[in-house]
């Protein structure tokens, strides 16, 4: 079986996670782009410095950066064929809809009837249950649980080990704190923390 070839933008922690995803599928990482010279040639992968469109144009590009706003900005500015990557030990039901650039890592679960927007990260051991709608440029952090029927707006961060209970709607650009339990819907552009989750910051 022919290997899929990739290049990454980003040479920080999330790049290492995504390198592991490629290895699980026996795919090939050709190069990493990052403007910070201190991060070049991490884990033996050749760094090309800042992104250049003419380097490995045949490869699929993944924005291996955890920050939602940065992923969105780069996706609008880069002219390259984007790829998605799913770890061999993730579970993604066949009746799901995945956008371009999706990153689903070790132990993650995406259940039947759910949709995951473009350039969204479903991180280690996170669960998206049935019939959820997860927007673009979302990050569901390690261990988070999204129960059935939840809707999550673009650019939202669901913190590590947070839980969103069934049928809640989470707005755009929301930050859900680590370990929070969301029991009701949350509007756009807020920070919510605690058990049960309460809004502590707007904007």
Q: At which residue positions do the language-model features occur?
A:
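Hydrophobic, well-ordered beta-alpha structural blocks that scaffold small-molecule cofactor pockets
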Residues: 1-52
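Generic structural signal for conserved hydrophobic packing positions in ordered secondary structure
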Residues: 10, 61, 82, 129-130
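Short amphipathic alpha-helical segments
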Residues: 19-22, 45, 73-77, 116, ...
């Amino acid at each position: 079986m022919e290997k899929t070839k990739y290049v990454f933008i980003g040479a920080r922690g999330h790049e290492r996670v995504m390198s592991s995803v490629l290895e699980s599928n026996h795919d090939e990482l050709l190069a990493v782009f990052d403007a910070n010279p201190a991060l070049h040639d991490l884990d033996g992968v050749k760094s090309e410095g800042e992104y250049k469109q003419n380097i490995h144009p045949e490869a699929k590009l993944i924005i291996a950066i955890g920050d939602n706003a940065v992923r969105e900005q780069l996706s609008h500015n880069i002219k390259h064929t984007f790829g998605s990557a799913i770890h061999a030990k993730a579970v993604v039901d066949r009746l799901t809809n995945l956008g371009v650039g999706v990153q689903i890592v070790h132990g993650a679960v995406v259940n039947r009837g759910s949709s995951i927007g473009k350039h969204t990260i479903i991180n280690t051991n996170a669960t998206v249950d049935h019939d959820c709608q997860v927007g673009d440029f979302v990050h569901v952090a390690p261990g988070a649980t999204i129960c059935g029927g939840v809707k999550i707006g673009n650019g939202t961060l669901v913190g590590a080990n947070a839980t969103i209970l069934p049928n809640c709607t989470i707005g755009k650009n929301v930050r859900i704190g680590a370990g929070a339990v969301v029991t009701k819907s949350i509007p756009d552009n807020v920070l919510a923390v605690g058990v049960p989750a309460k809004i502590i910051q707007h904007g």
